[in-house]
Amino acid sequence: AWDMRGHGASVGAANLSTFRGWEIYYRDLIALLECLDEPVWLAGHSIGATTSIMAAARRPDKVLGLILAEPVIMDPMQGLKLWLTKLLRQSQRLSLAAGAARRRRVFQSHAAALENYRGRGGFKTWPEAWLNAYVQHAFVPQGDQVQLACAPEWESTTFAHTEHNPWPGIRQLRCPVIALAAERGSTF
């Protein structure tokens, strides 16, 4: 599995001073695809799904198909609002970006992180097994504690740059697509 820049095992590649938007994610995934001998299926959630769309559009010879869980695809009006927010330098005030910036970074243990997330916010509907898997993989050892693998500042900055329009990429797709969406109440 590939970790997007600043997420999971690729945290060392995250540089806030050079981050200008999701294009870096698209380029990273395309660079990975170019190292592979055979085309592959791509699967992703949220930003990962949108990144997969853009990589498949730009390198159709490397992608057999897509499995997309809640890709970030906004209607034009919502996209315009986000673009204006960025233009006015107010992106960090978006609810997702602001919430990510406030995320607690360090816990005494995986068990403490699990207890903190259980029944709260976006996690309140998650089965225990899913929540446990999330906590086991979203946190890395830091001394005698655990910390988020994706720094709150990086996640917040990524959310603050949610203005990308994937529609041109969607129109270029030439592979099978399986798209999954929440039945009710998604992120936006």
List each model region and its residues.
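Hydrophobic/aromatic beta-strand patches that form the interior of the parallel beta-sheet core
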Residues: 6, 67, 178-180
